[in-house]
C-alpha cells in the first residue's frame, strides 16, 4: 500500500519544522502557512476562529493530499494588522475556549458523580 506509516503522520522528521510561513504574493497583507503533521482537525478549527476576527478578510485551508498530514492555511488581514498576529490571537482564543470547556466538563462530571453516589 502507498500510505505512509502511521507514526509518520504525527512525528516530525529530523530538521523538519512544524510551521513554514511564506508571504502570499497574490494578495496584500497575506501569508500562506504550511503546517506539518496536522490535518483537517486543526485546520478547520483555526480557520473558523480566524473568521471570528473582524480584521481578518480571508482565511481558508487546504489539505493537498489525504495521505500526507500537511495543510496550508491562507490568511489575509486588513492593513496594519499582521496575519501572524491574527494567527496568534486565534490560537490563544482556542486555548481559552478549550480551557473553559475542560472546566465545565469537569464540573458537570463531578456533579454527576456526586449525584450518583448520593443515589445509593
UniProtKB/Swiss-Prot annotation:
Localization of this protein: Nucleus
InterPro entries: RBP11 (IPR037685), RBP11-like (IPR036603), RBP11-like_dimer (IPR009025), RNA_pol_Rpb11_13-16kDa_CS (IPR008193), Rpo11-like (IPR022905)
Entry GO terms, CC: nucleus; RNA polymerase II, core complex
GO molecular function, one term: protein dimerization activity
Secretion signal span: none
Domain of life: Eukaryota
Function statement: DNA-dependent RNA polymerase catalyzes the transcription of DNA into RNA using the four ribonucleoside triphosphates as substrates. Component of RNA polymerase II which synthesizes mRNA precursors and many functional non-coding RNAs. Pol II is the central component of the basal RNA polymerase II transcription machinery. It is composed of mobile elements that move relative to each other. RPB11 is part of the core element with the central large cleft. Seems to be involved transcript termination.
Self-association state and partner proteins as the record states: Component of the RNA polymerase II (Pol II) complex consisting of 12 subunits.
Note from the entry: Present with 4280 molecules/cell in log phase SD medium.
Homology family: Belongs to the archaeal Rpo11/eukaryotic RPB11/RPC19 RNA polymerase subunit family.
HAMAP family in the record: RNApol_arch_Rpo11
Protein name from the UniProt record: DNA-directed RNA polymerase II subunit RPB11
Annotated gene: RPB11
